[in-house]
Amino acid sequence: MGKSNSKLKPEVVEELTRKTYFTEKEVQQWYKGFIKDCPSGQLDAAGFQKIYKQFFPFGDPTKFATFVFNVFDENKDGRIEFSEFIQALSVTSRGTLDEKLRWASKLYDLDNDGYITRNEMLDIVDAIYQMVGNTVELPEEENTPEKRVDRIFAMMDKNADGKLTLQEFQEGTKADPSIVQALSLYDGLV
């Protein structure tokens, strides 16, 4: 993408409009903001973490932001270009429940082997607990990452093999209204 250009080429806007749930005008607006914050046209992990720190000032979002960064960074070059950013934003903010669940499963499947292991889920849940800090009062049965993961696996790991397939993850998540609600949090806000 162009260095500090305030406008995208029409063919790029058209392509991103086709690939996302955003209008041409919205793509242009997001690009303008992206270039303002990232004049190089790219966002690195440290910059991404800084953004998360603004939203979670009472916890430590570093670990979670790194996990999210890795999902946004589709081509795995250590930087998020605008096209990667807008496509991930589209799914997380306006995608269908199944699209959001596929995206979330990429977040949890840290080694990209198609399964979410207990340890992978523990890494993510621990990162979430660090990020929110003491700002959220958790029920006794979920007040540690380990307890939360035990509860999730008891509910979702139907064949008790210690790992979740995409199907188990999707079905289990849909059966838990609190998870569906969390995934729908940003609907209509962007």
UniProtKB/Swiss-Prot annotation:
Keywords: Calcium, Cell membrane, Cytoplasm, Golgi apparatus, Lipoprotein, Membrane, Metal-binding, Myristate, Repeat, Synapse. One of its GO terms (cellular component) is perinuclear region of cytoplasm. A lipid is attached at residue 2 (N-myristoyl glycine). PROSITE patterns: EF_HAND_1, EF_HAND_2. It holds the Pfam family EF-hand_7. Ca(2+) 3 binds at residues 157, 159, 161, 163, 168. It is found in: Golgi apparatus; Postsynaptic density; Cytoplasm, Perinuclear region; Cytoplasm. This is Neuronal calcium sensor 1.
